[in-house]
Amino acid sequence: MSNRTALVFGGTRGIGAACVQKLAESGYDVAYTYVTSAPNLPAKIGSSKTKGYAVDICQPAQVAQVFADVARDFGGAPHCVVANAGINVPPGPLAQFDPENFRKLVEVNIVGAFHVLSAAARNVRDGGNIIALTTSMVRVAVPGGGPYTASKAAVESLLRSMSKELAPRKVRVNGVAPGPVDTDLFRAGKNEEAVARSAAMSPFNRVGQPEEVAEVVSFLASDKASWVHGQIIQPNGGMV
């Protein structure tokens, strides 16, 4: 997989950082984005080059610019784009849900994802692939989780359309929808009892690890997944 470049949006923590590591180990040079302070990540992982860029995905000009920067710094457009950047907010029943928190979810998880996926569709190389992170919770009714899962369901709808639109260019489009994964984003606002309830949703009685999700992303980014297109893969430990 030499001389291929991946661009990971939201690549400095949790699942995103694991994706950067795994894609680099699989042979990709990896560009990644962050929001504020530059992360302390190495400039190379093994023989693969890595470089970070400050990008607010809610600003379409910044999203467009990072594709130009990656083309300049890595010798061309990316072969793979991973749309991982997003937020969560405290859950709650719809009747009492803070409208401002819902607005934030829409702004980042839907509008921001739209900017990333739209730019990816314009810039990814022919024969490349686009992967977006969503959530298995889209298919599970969980009290209090409706606003967040609605924002991720919107991303899945965009992916389904893109899979048809980009097929003439042989660009594969897929989603990865993990169940609960042990990240800072997942643990924010949860006590240990809430974490245990999430773990109990899997028959293995645990939550996933970022590296387990990154393995799926790496597979989809590889030639081994050449016949996987328009799919939502759910690494969730059997959560049904």
Spans of model-derived segments:
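Conserved glycine-rich cofactor-binding loop
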Residues: 12-13
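Conserved glycine-rich Rossmann-like NAD(P)H-binding loop of the short-chain dehydrogenase/reductase
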Residues: 26-42
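Active-site Tyr-X3-Lys motif and surrounding loop/helix of classical short-chain dehydrogenase/reductase
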Residues: 65, 69-72, 92-96, 100-107, ...
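Catalytic Tyr-X3-Lys loop
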Residues: 79, 95-114, 131, 155, ...
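Conserved mid-core segment of classical short-chain dehydrogenase/reductases
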Residues: 86-103, 144-147, 186-190
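Short C-terminal tail/terminal secondary-structure segment
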Residues: 91, 218, 229-240
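Active-site helix of classical SDR
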Residues: 117, 151
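Alpha-helical segment proximal to the catalytic Tyr-Lys
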Residues: 122, 164-168, 226
